[in-house]
């Protein structure tokens, strides 16, 4: 409710991190971020990753508005989003016609992240989400989004976009877990930490909320943790093997 009533949602995010949990919180808070960024003279550029979009996407409309208002707008759109390939091609053409720079990801990788980087004169802002920037999905799927102005996080979100545009350039991350190179090793280390805690008689537990879990090494490590006495709770929407 606080985000819905604030005069400037960008200034509100600069004051402290904001967290929305759809569908229990309104996805409109995020739409407001894009709309304000599109109109604000303080905003210089907007970078967004897109995977699935609503049929009458307010996200796309806000990005087109931003481009027409002179912002440098860059959209990374995944053409291999299952069942949405044709739709994403259509959106790509519409964005390009409006003056948006459209990037089609990195060869050999699928861009599945949901990220926004907003470059501002008075302090950059980033949004990191688990769900598609899709108004329809946000009404039925439970997802999270963090909106922050913390420099150490915003810088790394910016680095993700730099990697996508120049994948030959080595990039290291300290705050974000970025697959395919860093996420799995970190998850395995975290599970190992809980195994060690359990063996030392300390409190040890793992809670996972995820769409699918099919990585054999991670599944095997969870079995190992369970056998070691780690309390494990898994909430999995789709495949579990």
Predicted segment positions?
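N-terminal localization/anchoring segments of enzymes in phospholipid and broader phosphate metabolism
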Residues: 1-206, 224-228, 238-241
